[in-house]
Amino acid sequence: MRTLALLAAILLVTLQAQAELHSGMADDGVDQQQPRAQDLDVAVYIKQDETSPLEVLGAKAGVSCTCRRFSCGFGERASGSCTVNGVRHTLCCRR
């Protein structure tokens, strides 16, 4: 599987290099004062409205969930992850 991923990465880099070479030849007649798309810095921020896992699991009767730093305790099951102060933890739930 790693070999396949490595070969795919090499193929993509090769294709990108060829595309840049061909676009460089085509752009020789273009005014050098115009910025190219690759020269522009773009920042994209995406924010989604999400329901927290605690709200989803807490809606079921008899479910109690806790954010744990390491692993779930006896009788608890890992049900996802949660973030506390920017640190990702394990979401452990008990029925």
From Swiss-Prot:
SUPFAM superfamilies given for it?
A: Defensin-like
Q: Which UniProt keywords apply?
A: Antibiotic, Antimicrobial, Defensin, Disulfide bond, Secreted, Signal
> What function does the entry list?
Microbicidal activity.
Q: Where is the signal peptide?
A: 1-19
Q: Which SMART domains match?
A: Defensin_propep (SM01418), DEFSN (SM00048)
Q: Does the keyword Metal-binding apply?
A: no
Where is it mainly found?
Answer: secreted
Which residues form the pro-region? Answer: 20-62
Protein's cellular compartments = Secreted
S-S pairs = 65-93, 67-82, 72-92
Concerning PANTHER family, the annotation shows: ALPHA-DEFENSIN 1
Q: Which organism is it from?
A: Oryctolagus cuniculus
Protein known as: Neutrophil antibiotic peptide NP-4
GO-annotated cellular components = extracellular matrix; extracellular space
Q: Which InterPro entries match?
A: Alpha-defensin (IPR016327), Alpha-defensin_C (IPR006081), Alpha-defensin_N (IPR002366), Beta/alpha-defensin_C (IPR006080)
List, alphabetically, the Pfam families matched.
Defensin_1, Defensin_propep
GO BP terms, alphabetized: antibacterial humoral response; antimicrobial humoral immune response mediated by antimicrobial peptide; cellular response to lipopolysaccharide; defense response to Gram-negative bacterium; defense response to Gram-positive bacterium; disruption of plasma membrane integrity in another organism; innate immune response in mucosa
Keyword Signal listed? The answer is: yes
Family (UniProt): Belongs to the alpha-defensin family.
